[in-house]
Swiss-Prot record:
<comment type="subunit">
    <text>Monomer.</text>
</comment>
<protein>
    <recommendedName>
        <fullName>Peptidyl-tRNA hydrolase</fullName>
        <ecNumber>3.1.1.29</ecNumber>
    </recommendedName>
</protein>
<dbReference type="GO" id="GO:0004045">
    <property type="term" value="F:peptidyl-tRNA hydrolase activity"/>
</dbReference>
<feature type="binding site">
    <location>
        <position position="15"/>
    </location>
    <ligand>
        <name>tRNA</name>
    </ligand>
</feature>
<feature type="binding site">
    <location>
        <position position="114"/>
    </location>
    <ligand>
        <name>tRNA</name>
    </ligand>
</feature>
<dbReference type="Pfam" id="PF01195">
    <property type="entry name" value="Pept_tRNA_hydro"/>
</dbReference>
<dbReference type="InterPro" id="IPR036416">
    <property type="entry name" value="Pept_tRNA_hydro_sf"/>
</dbReference>
<feature type="active site" description="Proton acceptor">
    <location>
        <position position="20"/>
    </location>
</feature>
<comment type="similarity">
    <text>Belongs to the PTH family.</text>
</comment>
<keyword id="KW-0378">Hydrolase</keyword>
<feature type="binding site">
    <location>
        <position position="66"/>
    </location>
    <ligand>
        <name>tRNA</name>
    </ligand>
</feature>
<dbReference type="GO" id="GO:0006515">
    <property type="term" value="P:protein quality control for misfolded or incompletely synthesized proteins"/>
</dbReference>
<comment type="function">
    <text>Hydrolyzes ribosome-free peptidyl-tRNAs (with 1 or more amino acids incorporated), which drop off the ribosome during protein synthesis, or as a result of ribosome stalling.</text>
</comment>
<dbReference type="InterPro" id="IPR018171">
    <property type="entry name" value="Pept_tRNA_hydro_CS"/>
</dbReference>
<dbReference type="GO" id="GO:0072344">
    <property type="term" value="P:rescue of stalled ribosome"/>
</dbReference>
<comment type="function">
    <text>Catalyzes the release of premature peptidyl moieties from peptidyl-tRNA molecules trapped in stalled 50S ribosomal subunits, and thus maintains levels of free tRNAs and 50S ribosomes.</text>
</comment>
<keyword id="KW-0694">RNA-binding</keyword>
């Protein structure tokens, strides 16, 4: 069963619409669905709410520590409520998936994502669930003829808002993620994965 759902992003109005904040977008939607408001909770270093979703009590969290220190916030909630790593779902932006794609997985490396890297370090475990929201990679914007030797600026890319057509398909992928939340929260993660991965 999933007891804690974390959305990753950076705090501050200047980052709200950026690709790196896709995890926040999903958790914001969940809070709206639950009719609750995330509030600044100092002891958890983030915006936090206890919500009732699909008949279960779930903790929602958006770390306000900046991305590369997200683990500090996640571990604070996990320790306080005695939540195990495999009862945690982290929603985050994923460079290795195209916009419009969304995938669910348990464990694995960080794929260069500093938020995941810090969460893994703080939990001393990779065995937490990830909901990977595709944002595409800046190399995909470089014409193939010019790709050899080109160094895409990943840091700049994730801190910029998606183009309109990308935003539309990212929003649609988040809706698909929300559609499988009943299974995810109840612990039917294999079923959720099959349903989610039937779509691109």
């Amino acid at each position: 069963m999933i007891k804690l759902i974390v959305g990753l992003g950076n705090p501050g109005a200047e980052y709200t619409a950026t690709r790196h904040n896709a995890g926040f977008w999903l958790v914001d939607q969940l809070a709206r669905e639950a009719g609750t408001t995330l509030r600044d909770e100092r002891r958890f270093h983030g915006f936090y709410a206890k919500a009732r979703l699909h008949g279960e009590e779930v903790h929602l969290l958006e770390p306000q520590t900046y991305m590369n220190r997200s683990g500090q916030s996640v571990v604070a909630v996990a320790q306080f409520f005695k939540i195990l790593p495999d009862e945690i779902l982290v929603a985050h932006d994923e460079l290795d998936l195209p916009p419009g794609s969304i995938k669910l997985k348990l464990g694995g490396g960080s794929g260069g994502h500093n938020g995941l890297k810090d969460i893994t370090a703080h939990l001393s475990s990779q065995q937490y669930w990830r909901l990977r929201i595709g944002i595409g990679h800046p190399r995909d914007l470089i014409p193939e003829s010019a790709r050899a030797g080109a160094k895409p600026d990943v840091a700049n890319y994730v801190l910029k808002p998606p183009r309109r057509e990308e935003q539309d398909v990212i929003d649609a992928s988040i809706e698909r993620g929300l559609a499988v939340m009943p299974q995810i929260i109840k612990g039917e993660l294999e079923r959720a994965m099959m349903q989610l991965h039937r779509n691109p």
